[in-house]
């Protein structure tokens, strides 16, 4: 999800207790809109990440968020895993390991659980991540676990403290840090590394996030060249960063990816969410067409993107969860 999308989802709901937010998230009454369940999830996230200041409430928030892993929605569960990784709260690590190694969970959910463990920097999860990297039947999950292992090792090596990194405009904890500023790459050099199939995946991701932080039209077009990559994981991450950047110049590229019927659902869903985040008028008919998409995660992503577009363009003061 894009940072701007998250900020809207995190707008505080004063009238809801943690228990009420949990009930909306898990759809206790059976009639909660998916968008409102997301809103409840991100409100619980805001509490879960305050584990230093409010440890008991943060623990409850983590437990309530984890209850949603019993849901049937692949989109919701993948967002649950993402949110847990972003909290920095290690209380969720054991549950994330279980979800990652549970092959009954959908691919996108296992992938996001693996990525979340990397975001947490949880060295205690390295063994489980190695197992996932070796044994998971999905290439996307195996690649995610490879990245998570490399990120944890990078963080533990001290490089995180010594490398000169650009101050990010984005609050997300990413699967890899951007390339260090100590080497003065230009955009064509970064594009070459981004698309170098012989380079380690972690380094290619670092090039990706350096291009994201540049954020110019030239950098966006360089990133768009990655949509020809054979890896669904790689392409979905490019769509994600386009949602963060919010540059309308990428709309045609995202539309083209979303229309690819052969493309992996994880890529197409991320393209739909990115289009919703950019929210120019020309994306509306595209998203509406995909409300009837063959892939459930794409249908749900289009619905959420349209709900958020309506909210952005209405006079509503509060995006009510109930």
From Swiss-Prot:
Keywords: Cytoplasm, Hypusine biosynthesis, Iron, Metal-binding, Monooxygenase, Nucleus, Oxidoreductase, Repeat. GO terms for molecular function: deoxyhypusine monooxygenase activity; metal ion binding. It is an enzyme of class 1 (oxidoreductase). It is found in: Cytoplasm; Nucleus. Fe cation 2 binds at residues 236-237, 269-270. Fe cation 1 binds at residues 78-79, 111-112. It catalyses: [eIF5A protein]-deoxyhypusine + AH2 + O2 = [eIF5A protein]-hypusine + A + H2O. InterPro entries: ARM-like (IPR011989), ARM-type_fold (IPR016024), Deoxyhypusine_hydroxylase (IPR027517), PBS_lyase_HEAT (IPR004155). GO terms for biological process: microtubule cytoskeleton organization. Its main location: cytoplasm. Gene3D superfamilies: Leucine-rich Repeat Variant. SUPFAM superfamilies: ARM repeat (SSF48371). Its cofactor is Fe(2+). Its EC number is 1.14.99.29. Pathway: Protein modification; eIF5A hypusination. GO terms for cellular component: cytoplasm; nucleus. Signal peptide: none annotated. Binds 2 Fe(2+) ions per subunit. HEAT-like PBS-type repeats lie at residues 76-102, 109-135, 234-260, 267-293. Catalyzes the hydroxylation of the N(6)-(4-aminobutyl)-L-lysine intermediate to form hypusine, an essential post-translational modification only found in mature eIF-5A factor. Belongs to the deoxyhypusine hydroxylase family. This is Deoxyhypusine hydroxylase. It comes from Eremothecium gossypii (strain ATCC 10895 / CBS 109.51 / FGSC 9923 / NRRL Y-1056) (Yeast). The gene is LIA1.
């Amino acid at each position: 999800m894009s940072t701007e999308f998250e900020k809207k989802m995190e707008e505080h709901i004063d009238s809801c207790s943690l228990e009420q937010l949990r009930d909306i998230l898990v759809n206790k009454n059976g009639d909660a809109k998916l968008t409102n369940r997301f809103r409840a999830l991100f409100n619980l996230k805001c509490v879960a990440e305050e584990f230093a200041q409010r440890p008991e409430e943060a623990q409850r928030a983590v437990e309530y968020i984890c209850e949603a892993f019993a849901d049937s929605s692949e989109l919701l569960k993948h967002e649950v895993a993402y949110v847990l990784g972003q909290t920095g709260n290690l209380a969720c690590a054991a549950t994330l390991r279980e979800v990652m190694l549970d092959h009954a969970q959908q691919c996108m959910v296992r992938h996001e659980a693996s990525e979340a463990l990397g975001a947490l920097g949880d060295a205690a999860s390295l063994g489980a991540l190695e197992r996932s990297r070796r044994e998971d039947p999905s290439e996307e999950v195996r690649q995610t676990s490879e990245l998570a292992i490399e990120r944890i090792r990078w963080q533990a090596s001290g490089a995180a403290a010594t490398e000169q990194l650009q101050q990010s405009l984005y609050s997300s904890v990413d699967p890899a840090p951007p390339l260090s500023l100590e080497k003065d790459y230009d955009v064509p050099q970064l594009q070459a590394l981004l698309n170098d199939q012989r380079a380690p995946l972690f380094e290619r991701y670092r090039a990706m996030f350096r291009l994201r932080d540049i954020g110019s039209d030239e950098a966006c077009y360089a990133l768009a060249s990655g949509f020809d990559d054979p890896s669904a994981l790689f392409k979905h991450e490019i769509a994600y960063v386009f949602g963060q950047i919010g540059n309308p110049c990428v709309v045609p590229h995202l539309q083209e990816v979303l229309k690819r019927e052969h493309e992996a659902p994880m890529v197409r869903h991320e393209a739909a969410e990115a289009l919703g985040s950019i929210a120019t008028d020309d994306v509306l008919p595209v998203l509406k067409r995909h409300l009837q998409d063959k892939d459930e995660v794409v249908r749900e992503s289009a619905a959420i993107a349209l709900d958020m577009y309506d909210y952005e363009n209405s006079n509503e003061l509060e995006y009510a969860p109930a």
